[in-house]
Amino acid sequence: MTNIRKTHPLLKIINSSFVDLPAPSSLSSWWNFGSLLGVCLGVQILTGLFLAMHYTSDTATAFNSVTHICRDVNYGWLLRYLHANGASMFFICLYLHVGRGLYYGSYTYSETWNIGILLLFAVMATAFMGYVLPWGQMSFWGATVITNLLSAIPYIGTELVQWIWGGFSVYKATLTRFFAFHFLLPFIVAALVMVHLLFLHETGSNNPTGIPSDPDMIPFHPYYTIKDILGFLVMLTALATLVLFSPDLLGDPDNYIPANPLITPPHIKPEWYFFFAYAILRSIPNKLGGVLALVMSILILAIVPILHMSKQRSMMFRPLSQCLFWLLVAVLFTLTWIGGQPVEHPYIIIGQTASVLYFLIILFLMPMTSMVENYLLKW
């Protein structure tokens, strides 16, 4: 008798995606982050759902409802901090996942890569709107500053900002719609994840060598399921440690002050995982230029496949490109640090230098290095 998992209309989809899926035998731990992102999304949707049962999206009560969740709801503090720090884990896994794709040339699967970029934008939008919901000082001023950037768009900018705000400033209508979108977007993200996997399973996974692995495949289960479970345990342990020992480590103390439109915080900044993009935005002394640089800092990923000049797919056997890749990582760490600092000397010039380097490495140095490597290998 044929196994039910191979014949049942629903089970056979799951079977071909997670059980009998042929996978390259050489996948390293860098391939764990896709499944870790799935776990992060699940944790965020579950904790978010329970938080939404107690949260009120009204300017008069939003801040107090979050306090109520932490103080009066059974394990409400745990839900709240799992959700807040879960977002940080989500972005750590996201950036490592994208970095893995860049290093090993996974971007040559253009459909999977482009859906991934779309997912990155969707998750960033979700996280930004979630940061507004507690209605603390940084929530209010962060929302005001970031949405106001759209006013830099010629002709329609001002009307667009007022349309998003639902009035002439960030107030009740803004908070209500941000809550609605923050609730809705994760489900759209989940749908996009399925499309992402659909395209991935059309081509099969890449592997560290970048060499086609068709002759050497192994079943996903049990080899990679057990490997993924180890990844889950490591990540959930890290998340639990963060939540139980230092839940406010990655947050902003200003967000424990209720939103006040009359008092501006000394340093308005987003959550730490947006610091690199925020630093690029601030490094250009022109509003429209800054907004374009901000968008391009993520959108540049879409042209990476076009800039691939190497005859090899992966960077595994390309030491010059490896040096550039790790320089890019160092630049991103520098930008992340600068994004959290005040706008004063020497941070301004460091941020501007790092921003120029970021675009220079991706747009010029990496393709040129690839061509040099091709020449050295007489290809």
Swiss-Prot record:
The keyword Ligase does not apply. It holds the Pfam family Cytochrome_B. Heme b b566 binds at residues 97, 196. CDD domains: cytochrome_b_C, Cytochrome_b_N. GO terms for molecular function: metal ion binding; ubiquinol-cytochrome-c reductase activity. Keywords: Electron transport, Heme, Iron, Membrane, Metal-binding, Mitochondrion, Mitochondrion inner membrane, Respiratory chain, Transmembrane, Transmembrane helix, Transport, Ubiquinone. The keyword Ribonucleoprotein does not apply. The chain crosses the membrane at residues 33-53, 77-98, 113-133, 178-198, 226-246, 288-308, 320-340, 347-367. PROSITE patterns: CYTB_CTER, CYTB_NTER. One of its GO terms (biological process) is mitochondrial electron transport, ubiquinol to cytochrome c. The gene is MT-CYB. It comes from the Eukaryota. The cytochrome bc1 complex contains 11 subunits: 3 respiratory subunits (MT-CYB, CYC1 and UQCRFS1), 2 core proteins (UQCRC1 and UQCRC2) and 6 low-molecular weight proteins (UQCRH/QCR6, UQCRB/QCR7, UQCRQ/QCR8, UQCR10/QCR9, UQCR11/QCR10 and a cleavage product of UQCRFS1). This cytochrome bc1 complex then forms a dimer. Coiled coil: none annotated. Component of the ubiquinol-cytochrome c reductase complex (complex III or cytochrome b-c1 complex) that is part of the mitochondrial respiratory chain. The b-c1 complex mediates electron transfer from ubiquinol to cytochrome c. Contributes to the generation of a proton gradient across the mitochondrial membrane that is then used for ATP synthesis. PANTHER family: CYTOCHROME B. Binds 2 heme b groups non-covalently. Its cofactor is heme b. A ubiquinone binds at residue 201. Signal peptide: none annotated. Heme b b562 binds at residues 83, 182. This is Cytochrome b.
